[in-house]
């Protein structure tokens, strides 16, 4: 790269309150189009908004978890624009007095910790949803008025990889606070990215482009990587970067010009006359602060310092509260800490990715996973057998030992039976026997593999190693 990359992210998070930001309508995902609306959402003349106090509490909780200063006085403003899914022709947002400012989160990239500043967190209402179908469009106002918080980072991010790490950490923190389920596929987390380039050593920022239609963390990274390359090529060829909004095209992996970017003046912000300012005293702040649960960094430190897990394991296990809670419940049922960590990061994650399901959508429970891990610990079940048992355990639930027995996968621990497999392997692989005698350690591993293959993975591996060494020493 001939230039330094400067990235800032704007993340919208939908709060999972029961009702909307300024109306009593339900704020649930997945209802029939236009069924979760009332006269306030539809902007009937004369109706007045009423602030949802729980949404304010949750915005404060999120801001505190992000190490932000909470405003003593915060007000709402009108952001004026016309669009079919915005019935009032303005959005109630916050302009110059947001509820939270001056925060930060720490991210890890390539083994190094970096602090990313957060400029502000403000509250606003969501717009409806437009669906374009050929020559006509459909509008669903269920989402209109849903409470949002917008979290704006400082331009401290220097690469697409750092942007990805920031989003992962931000999502994790918000999920732990319980104020949102932060599911991109359901629209409860959305991200716009601003990116510009400047010569190394220059303090002044370059002209930025805003990227939209970033529907996954991978698309955020890919969109930024493409835009980084596009801007560099443009600057090196003597061209100029325009301040514009661009859309990421998932099929081509490129960004496409949407429009010349608007500034904040185009929205003609002014104070919302129908909502009085919020006055937040210390007692209110303290009440909210007491509701903040254990956050990912605290759990991570606990897993390393108290449970003895490697930092990498602790990082992976705490990425989502769902996985972290499952891990803690499993070891509470008596499963070995490291074995549980290995299974959650390995076999469990592989199963979830392969079947495109969430952990809580499976039949797996901390109790039945702990049961399987204890069978591995005491030698009743080998790792190979566990890999065959696990998919059924996750899909149907039940008991790992019963699944093993029902499928004829019981581990062979009878010495006489195992000796037959051992001697057969030795007779069929005389060269490996010679290699072992000549000090080649790999020969032992090869012979164990042959025995496990012959027994269809059901031989007790510890006993196999013991008997194999015993028989080799006789030859």
UniProtKB/Swiss-Prot annotation:
It catalyses: L-glutamyl-tRNA(Gln) + L-glutamine + ATP + H2O = L-glutaminyl-tRNA(Gln) + L-glutamate + ADP + phosphate + H(+); L-aspartyl-tRNA(Asn) + L-glutamine + ATP + H2O = L-asparaginyl-tRNA(Asn) + L-glutamate + ADP + phosphate + 2 H(+). GO terms for molecular function: asparaginyl-tRNA synthase (glutamine-hydrolyzing) activity; ATP binding; glutaminyl-tRNA synthase (glutamine-hydrolyzing) activity. Keywords: ATP-binding, Ligase, Nucleotide-binding, Protein biosynthesis. Pfam families: GatB_N, GatB_Yqey. The keyword Ligase applies. InterPro entries: Asn/Gln-tRNA_amidoTrfase_suB/E, Asn/Gln-tRNA_Trfase_suB/E_cat, Asn/Gln_amidotransferase, Asn/Gln_tRNA_amidoTrase-B-like, GatB, GatB_C_1, GatB_Yqey_C_2, Gln-tRNA_amidoTrfase_suB_CS. One of its GO terms (biological process) is glutaminyl-tRNAGln biosynthesis via transamidation. It is an enzyme of class 6 (ligase). Its EC number is 6.3.5.-. Allows the formation of correctly charged Asn-tRNA(Asn) or Gln-tRNA(Gln) through the transamidation of misacylated Asp-tRNA(Asn) or Glu-tRNA(Gln) in organisms which lack either or both of asparaginyl-tRNA or glutaminyl-tRNA synthetases. The reaction takes place in the presence of glutamine and ATP through an activated phospho-Asp-tRNA(Asn) or phospho-Glu-tRNA(Gln). HAMAP family: GatB (MF_00121). Belongs to the GatB/GatE family. GatB subfamily. Heterotrimer of A, B and C subunits. This is Aspartyl/glutamyl-tRNA(Asn/Gln) amidotransferase subunit B. It comes from Staphylococcus aureus (strain MRSA252). The lineage of its organism: Bacteria, Bacillati, Bacillota, Bacilli, Bacillales.
């Amino acid at each position: 790269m001939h230039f330094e990359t400067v990235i800032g992210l704007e993340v919208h998070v939908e709060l999972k309150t029961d009702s909307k930001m300024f109306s009593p309508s339900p704020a649930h995902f997945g209802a029939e189009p236009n069924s979760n609306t009332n006269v306030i959402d539809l902007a009937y003349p004369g109706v007045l908004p009423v602030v949802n106090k729980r949404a304010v509490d949750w915005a404060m909780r999120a801001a505190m978890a992000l190490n932000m200063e909470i405003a003593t006085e915060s007000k709402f403003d009108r952001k004026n624009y016309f669009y079919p899914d915005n019935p009032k022709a303005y959005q109630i947002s916050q302009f110059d007095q947001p509820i939270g400012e001056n925060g930060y989160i720490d991210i890890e990239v390539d083994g190094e910790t970096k602090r990313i500043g957060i400029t502000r967190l403000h509250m606003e209402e969501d717009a409806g949803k437009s669906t374009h179908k050929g020559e006509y469009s459909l509008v669903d106002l269920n989402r209109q008025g849903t409470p949002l918080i917008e979290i704006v980072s400082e331009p401290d991010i220097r690469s697409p990889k750092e942007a990805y790490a920031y989003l992962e950490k931000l999502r994790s923190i918000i999920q732990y606070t319980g104020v949102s389920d932060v599911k991109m596929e359901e629209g409860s987390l959305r991200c716009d990215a601003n990116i510009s380039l400047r010569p190394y050593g220059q303090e002044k920022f370059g002209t930025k482009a805003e990227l939209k239609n970033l529907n996954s963390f991978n698309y955020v990274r890919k969109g930024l990587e493409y835009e980084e390359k596009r801007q560099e090529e443009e600057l090196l060829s003597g061209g100029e970067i325009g301040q514009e909004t661009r859309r990421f095209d998932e099929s081509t992996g490129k960004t496409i010009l949407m429009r010349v970017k608007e500034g904040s003046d185009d929205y003609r912000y002014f104070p919302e006359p129908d909502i009085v300012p919020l006055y937040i005293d210390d007692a209110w702040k303290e009440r909210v602060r007491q509701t903040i649960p254990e956050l990912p960094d605290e759990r991570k430190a606990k897993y390393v310092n108290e449970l003895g897990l490697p930092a990498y394991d602790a990082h992976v296990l705490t990425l989502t509260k769902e996985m972290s809670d499952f891990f803690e419940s499993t070891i509470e049922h008596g499963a070995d800490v490291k074995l549980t960590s290995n299974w959650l990061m390995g076999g469990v994650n592989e199963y979830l990715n392969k079947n495109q399901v969430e952990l809580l959508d499976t039949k797996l429970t901390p109790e039945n996973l702990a049961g399987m891990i204890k069978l591995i610990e005491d030698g009743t079940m080998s790792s190979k057998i566990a890999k065959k048992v696990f998919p059924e355990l996750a899909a149907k639930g039940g008991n790992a030992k019963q699944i093993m027995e029902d499928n004829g996968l019981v581990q062979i621990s009878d010495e006489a039976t195992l000796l037959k497999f051992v001697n057969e392997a030795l007779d069929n692989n005389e060269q490996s026997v010679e290699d072992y005698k000549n000090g080649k350690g790999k020969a032992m591993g090869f012979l164990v593999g042959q025995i496990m293959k012959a027994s269809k993975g059901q031989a007790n591996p510890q006993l196999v190693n013991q008997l194999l060494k015993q028989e080799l020493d006789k030859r």
